[in-house]
């Protein structure tokens, strides 16, 4: 008998596979991101709420289990930098240009089931350049992925969501280059506004979460954050990270380390 389904496919399969597994009464471990779109994620939440508590689920954000993330959560929730009003999160990765929307047909190998790989995506002829090179290739395309934010944001934004007990935002604003119907943006700055949370006084303030990726995103991040973190932290040395801006100081963290500014903290 099958008890658990592990889903580590390209992102456009995640919601369909997870939903089908839960409907079949199976527990689900799904790699990040949970879904291809926000709409799909909400559908999965509805399915889970209908079937709970008989189904156990987990998303593959393995860094959530590390000592460093747990320690940063303790510092923030314990008031080391005071109430936090802003968190700035970033990844220096960008999205290379997708020059051809629909690639020319190639012979499909006998060992490759192209229709299965396409799954719920729009039909097209086989071409290995759609997937060759792994997720850094197919994740460029809206049909199969959701770009740097969908890929890396799942890991990095997990930290402020956990530390600040965040839920669905009140507002969302995205700034970037002109929208490309085929390819995800090479750079992006996204702002979410969150309401205050009840309970812990260190969480009882509205929070703005800002995401940056790509060259222009990194420039805006550095211009804003370097004066705030001071000489204790050279923000350009952090290719990925999150900076919690509190009333009493700043904590900057990535997967494996954190620093407090001012250092006297």
Question: Where would I find each of the regions flagged by the language model?
Answer:
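N-terminal Rossmann-like NAD(P) cofactor-binding module of classical short-chain dehydrogenase/reductase
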Residues: 3-6
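Active-site-proximal beta-strand/loop segments in catalytic clefts of secreted hydrolases
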Residues: 8-9, 31-33, 60-62, 90-92, ...
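Alpha-helical packing segments of well-folded alpha/beta enzyme cores
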Residues: 17, 40, 68, 156-159
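Contiguous beta-strand/loop segments that form the cofactor/metal-binding neighborhood of enzyme cores
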Residues: 70-71, 83, 88-92, 97-265
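Structured segments of extracytoplasmic/periplasmic soluble domains
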Residues: 8, 44-47, 75-78, 90, ...
